[in-house]
Amino acid sequence: MVKSAPGYLFCMSQSSSELQNSALEIFSRLNSQQSEAVKETDRPLLIIAGAGSGKTLTVASKIAYLIASGVPPEHILALTFNQKAAEELKVRVTEMLKCPADLNISTFHSFCNQVIHDNILNTKLNANFKVITETAQLVYLAKNINSFGLEHLAFNHKPYTLAEEMKKFISRCKDEFVTPQDLQLYLEEHQKLSLDEEATEDLNNLKDILKIYQAYEAYKLQNNLLDFGDMLCIVHNLLKSKPIVLQSYQEKFQFVIVDEFQDTNYIQLQIVNLIAKKHGHITVVGDDDQSIYRFRGAHLTNIAEFKKTFPNFTEKTLGHNYRSTKKIVATANTLIENSPERTIKQLFTNNPPGNQIEVIETPNDTSQANYIVEITKNLLKTYQPQDIAILCRRRASAEPILNAFRKHALSFNFVGQTGFFQEPIIKDITAFLNILNNPIESNVEIVRILNRPNYGIKQVDIYKFTSYAKQTGLSFYETFDHLNKIAVDKLKFPIVKQTLTDLLNKKNRLRTIDLIHTILFEQEFYKYEVALKNTRNLQLLNQFYTFAEEFNNIYPDSDLEAFTDYLTYASNFEIEEKNDTEQAVIISTIHGVKGMQYPVVIIPDVNDRKIPATYQKDKFAIPKKLLKGIQSTYDDKELHTQEERRLFYVAITRAKEKLVITYANRHGENKTGSKPSRFLQEINYQQNPHIAFQQITSPEILIELTNTENQTKTKLLQQLIVNLTTGQFNDAIETVLLFAKITNKNLNIQTDIIKKIKEPNYTQLEQITTKKPLTVPSDHVFSVSQFVSYQKCPRQYHYRYVMKIPEKPRYYFEFGTTIHNIAEKLTRLQKEKQPVNEIIAEELLAKFWSSKSYQSELDEKRDYAEAKNILKNFLEEQNKSKTEILDIERWFEIAVGNVRIRGRIDRIDRDKTGYTVIDYKTSKTASSLNELKKDMQLLVYALAVKEIYGSTSQLKVGDWFLRPNKQVFFTPEIQAIENIQTEIHVMSKKINSAVFDPKKDAWNCRECDYACLCD
């Protein structure tokens, strides 16, 4: 039974009886299995949660039940597999409690990142460490392969392949907590032994691998970088080596919940065990049937480890599937029963039987792709695009389908690793950068730029331009100086020349990241795609800019040449594409949709050597002697087959209503046929009463003759938008006539039409341009800053939060961020009754300080001295304070009517009279009292505090301006709060209706990052 904290009430705006009612409501939504799992709080608990069994509901209910029963939210730690799952849990728990709670729900990596920052003085790290991306890891390894002094590893001039293998090996070492020192000791021990030829070769390879591992670790240390594995290892070491730190986390997190436990690795398990062992209040939730991350070091044996660590555990099973039809559930059961050593459970459902599962045999992979396009088109008559998911084992299986979707102009989201750098729009950006880096040797890139649609240059003119260059022996860049000798468009070519000249001039005075931002905006990449409403290309642009920012974070002093070199290496690797267009069919790897569900699922390429994929032994494996934890008794090949079966099971159980499985008898140019997957045999696909099997015999099924026509129409529509946005109205008319001709429409521009548009009918124009309403999802949660942005300018909000177009980098923010972070750390130390003085403040300043934003040593010294003075004044003021520090970085989520808003309050203090909300500011001047009284952020904070703590005798809110050391506070008036609530309702309705008209203001427009997009 949970013991309540004495006198504790986590939400003072609710009475004890209201919280008890919340607890009762929690159980009203649960079945008996779920209720038992939620109520079990006295012993370690293992929940085996079958697919679609309400796992998230159960976990959220358990957290809410603990809080409603009196456990302070800050004593509960919930760890999830990804950020999306963490956010969903937070939303669900908040809704159940009907009150904002400061919930510690995060991914393992986010949790470890926070632990490191909170204990930065106990580490050798600088607080400004950066997390190195997977791409940056691969680039470093590939680029430096010849500098590692390798003597035995043969990579046959394939540094990229070896880089991928090394990255995988090092990552596995981190997962297994195998250090370079461990490998060194292993080598020293085994060099003394008499070994056969194969073992000697493995040992020699390991010597070279150790050199790479050591060099990689030294590189990160030198550049203040961590990878994800480092974060886990550092926290593990911190908890093991610092008993005081371990004790503090054991007392802080007395209840630990781990979601997707089957996908945790050894080091994650050890961190959880260290924190939870003292109190034993641990709940792990998982399903061994859905363990699909063995390649990341996930241990299916972790369940056995849990039982060994917590022998007094109890086990609950959730087997009621709420997601899928009876036929889908029965088929999934039939498949997974072939897995050995699984926890025995049988999924069941009360859902209707549903349609038969369709298994389709096609002659080849081309006809398979076209069949999928055709059934998708038919499904779109009944379902929304985002209701349909096409789940592939690997990217290669998705490629023919992606191409077929492109040909038929069907919108899709791809989730998984992709040839990002081969996307046309990314090639265009890269072309600009290569020209600026070396214009004389960029002939191919210049041709690519001349073909950019926003320049509107005809192919015949490009041909004349390049022909002249070849005849004269000039580079294409030099040829721009001879335009008067070439019969080309004398208006358009000079524009390109001037563009390149301007950018080359800017190259010498702009940072690389600023130059990239200039190219994306001034060369109308964003403007063109915004006009086309091409969400996919907009997301690609956003992702490229993020890629550039990540490079800038790691190498802040690098020039354009270094970045283009980095690009060259990075383009040899596939990277994860970030695509979240809402109205689009999902095409994804199976791994990419773990935890998701869709009304319709299509699984292509269910062939042997596809699903299951062909087993490939790891080229470089960690010696088994160094592996920790319980090891499986099966060999690697059998473990691979078992995981592939679970992967197919995961794909099947994503489907709610309709499941289609396809396979092809032949792939590509292979003359040998492809066999259907052995897993299809396991579900008895030709005789199973739940399955309708169909053979498609026509080898060129459904290849429509309209593909070329569709592509031409799309190109003409794109050209029309270019004509209109660049003011080429005569060309626009020509494009319209061409479009009409292709669609077999007769278009006669008559004089009466011309007369009609001589005097524009603005009412008519308004009707034409009225925006189609965009419904914000019912579970959408706004941030306070989103409303502040909309209040400032709706169009700016649209670009920033809807289209997610990046803002300009602002280096002057870094000083303020540093001061803010240190003030927060000092306040936290004071709250925890730890010693705080100027020496500690200076230690923190040294840890948090970053030199990267300074180009002048003099400027840096000046700001560093100012920072020391600000912190000195802060401590002096803080020491005078008579208030109690109640909360720091207080997370909240509140409802204003039907609008949900979340945010974090820097600090909440309390004294005898009431509560004080403090927001730290680092601007050079303080705002006036009258300005703050209208500040939306502070008024929303007032609403949040009242909801968290209930009505108080007095509530003050305000800003502490740290640079001028001035505090401005006020008591919010009821009318002001009511006004802001009304304004939030009005703004949310406008956002929901896609009202994003610009708010014209000379100063704001001049300072706006998106001014060049806004006409």
Which residue stretches match the model-derived regions?
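Conserved motor-region signature of P-loop NTPase helicases/translocases
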Residues: 3-91, 202, 244, 251, ...
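A basic/glycine-biased coupling hinge at the interface between accessory DNA-binding modules
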Residues: 8-24, 42-43, 50-53, 64-233, ...
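Accessory/regulatory regions of helicases
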Residues: 12, 24, 583, 600, ...
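Conserved helicase core region in the C-terminal RecA-like lobe
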Residues: 104-114, 257-260, 285, 394-396, ...
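Accessory C-terminal helicase-associated subdomains
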Residues: 203-210, 215-216, 225, 384, ...
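Metal-dependent nuclease catalytic cores in nucleic-acid-processing enzymes
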Residues: 593, 644-659, 821, 827, ...
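Metal-dependent nuclease catalytic regions and adjoining charged, substrate-binding loops involved
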Residues: 595, 689-714, 839, 945-1015
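Non-catalytic protein-protein interaction segments used by genome-maintenance enzymes to assemble
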Residues: 887-948, 970, 980-984
